[in-house]
């Protein structure tokens, strides 16, 4: 593909302040690297978090273990993180990646095939759109967007530029979840009338943090990006950015997306709800936190079925011995899907009895499995090679649909009333106040373009 110089790209990206798209360079025909022996070069963006499979450390930790995949760059606004990340990539993959503070520099590198985004939520859309425009594939963490309108533009960009864009809803690649969904969609529990997701994860008190000088090596302006400018604050910069409205999608977006993605998939719902209610608040703590730590939402669909999502970030009881999982309620009984087991209980016309159970321990390995690698990353790389975005386990459209549910819940919470939504236009009906939350005021020049 044709390259563009940094000064040229930065100038073009500034044009986005007027709502114009960043001009994408021409994309080579026959981009596919179909041979498994051809190397796919990946850049990982956002490397502060190293745990699990969701943070940047988890991203490069997985990609480095896939044959003929090389992490050639790591990017973060905090340059203090580079030495450890470079050492870890070298240990895992055998090469020392270059380090980049400004994501836009990666867009000029014609040797990078894909970018993997593990940044705070408010950067996901713009990075994804920019990457698509210059012909790079994208793996983007959940929630895929900061606001609902961004998600639709991400889908449009992926399709317009024929990009492979995988959402980081890793359960889509779980054999256990796949088998549970097949059971449900085959009608073995009967007609499902309600699904429910719970996230009861205790979050400590973040307290109060005063503004302070910007640390050496931190590009605070780039961290804020599309968000309003504020003086540097360590709490807003660390993991606690999750709890401030400028950068947060609440725990709904942080973890609710995972649960409701499984609920929506199990119930085979590929449309938005039409009625949304949400209540909650910030309880039992005294701190700078702006978003709720208790939140419950109900979503009603055109055919009358209901979905619910509840978060509790304080000490609380469990449901069915679980503090994180999904439940399905149907004409023949109910089911629970957790991280390790899918359990069914039959109840129609008889005493509640345990039905079929599926355990992850009982599932035979598949040929594509690689020890120590989450299959979601393998699926992404396979589709990058084949150019078949249709084979993604979590295509960006599915990521948008599940993330949008959580945005709708947050909007109902912030407006404080029941909302009526047009699932096809993706607008609230006769409600300018609610519609104002579908997008945001962007700080220039970090505006998501009106046309991608």
PLM feature spans:
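Glycine-centered tight turns that cap/initiate beta-strands
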Residues: 68-70, 111, 188-191, 272
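Active-site-proximal cap/loop segments of hydrolase catalytic domains
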Residues: 74, 85, 89-92, 148-151, ...
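Short basic (Lys/Arg) and small-residue
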Residues: 142
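A contiguous active-site-proximal alpha/beta segment in oxidoreductase catalytic domains
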Residues: 137, 145-222
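Contiguous beta-strand/loop segments that form the cofactor/metal-binding neighborhood of enzyme cores
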Residues: 179, 190-191, 196-250, 254-452
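N-terminal glycine-/serine-/threonine-rich beta1-alpha1-beta2 phosphate-ribose binding loop
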Residues: 1-137, 149-164
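Residue-level signal for the nucleotide or nucleotide-sugar donor/cofactor binding architecture
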Residues: 4, 149, 175, 393-394
């Amino acid at each position: 593909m044709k390259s563009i110089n940094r000064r040229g790209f930065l100038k073009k990206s500034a044009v986005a302040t007027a709502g114009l798209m960043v001009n994408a360079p021409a994309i080579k025909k026959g981009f596919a690297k179909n041979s498994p022996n051809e190397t796919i070069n990946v850049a990982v963006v956002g490397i502060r978090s190293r745990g699990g499979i969701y943070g940047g450390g988890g991203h490069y930790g997985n990609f480095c273990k896939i044959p003929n995949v090389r992490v050639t760059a790591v990017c973060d606004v905090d340059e203090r993180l580079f030495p450890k990340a470079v050492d870890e990539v070298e240990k895992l993959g055998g090469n020392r990646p270059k380090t980049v503070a400004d994501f836009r520099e990666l867009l000029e590198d014609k040797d990078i095939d894909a970018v993997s985004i593990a940044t705070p939520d408010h950067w996901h859309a713009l990075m994804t759109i920019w990457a698509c425009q210059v012909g790079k594939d994208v793996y983007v963490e959940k929630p895929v967007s900061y606001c609902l309108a961004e998600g639709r533009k991400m889908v449009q960009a992926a399709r317009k530029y024929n990009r492979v864009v995988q959402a980081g809803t890793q359960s889509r690649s779980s054999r256990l979840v796949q088998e549970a969904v097949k059971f449900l969609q085959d009608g073995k529990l009967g007609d499902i009338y309600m699904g429910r997701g719970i996230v009861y994860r205790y979050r400590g008190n973040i307290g109060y943090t005063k503004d302070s000088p910007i640390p050496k090596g931190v590009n605070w302006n780039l961290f804020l990006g599309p968000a309003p400018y504020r003086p540097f604050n360590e709490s807003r910069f660390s993991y606690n950015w999750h709890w401030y409205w400028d950068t947060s999608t609440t725990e709904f977006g942080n973890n609710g997306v995972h649960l409701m993605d499984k609920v929506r998939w199990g119930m085979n719902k590929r449309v938005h709800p039409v009625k949304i209610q949400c209540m909650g608040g910030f309880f039992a703590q005294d701190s700078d936190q702006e978003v709720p730590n208790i939140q419950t939402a109900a979503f009603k669909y055109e055919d009358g079925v209901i979905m619910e999502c509840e978060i509790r970030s304080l000490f609380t009881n469990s449901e069915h011995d679980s503090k994180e999982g999904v439940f399905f309620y149907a004409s023949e009984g109910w089911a629970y899907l957790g991280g390790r087991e899918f359990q069914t209980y039959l109840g129609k016309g008889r005493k509640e009895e345990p039905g079929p159970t599926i355990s992850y321990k009982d599932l035979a390995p598949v040929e594509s499995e690689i020890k120590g690698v989450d299959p979601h990353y393998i699926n992404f790389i396979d589709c990058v090679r084949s150019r078949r975005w249709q084979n993604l386990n979590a295509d960006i459209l599915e990521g948008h649909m599940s993330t949008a549910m959580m945005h709708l819940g947050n909007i109902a919470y912030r407006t404080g009333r029941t909302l009526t939504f047009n699932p096809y236009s993706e607008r609230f009906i006769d409600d300018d106040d609610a519609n104002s939350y579908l997008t945001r005021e962007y700080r220039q020049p970090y505006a998501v373009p009106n046309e991608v």
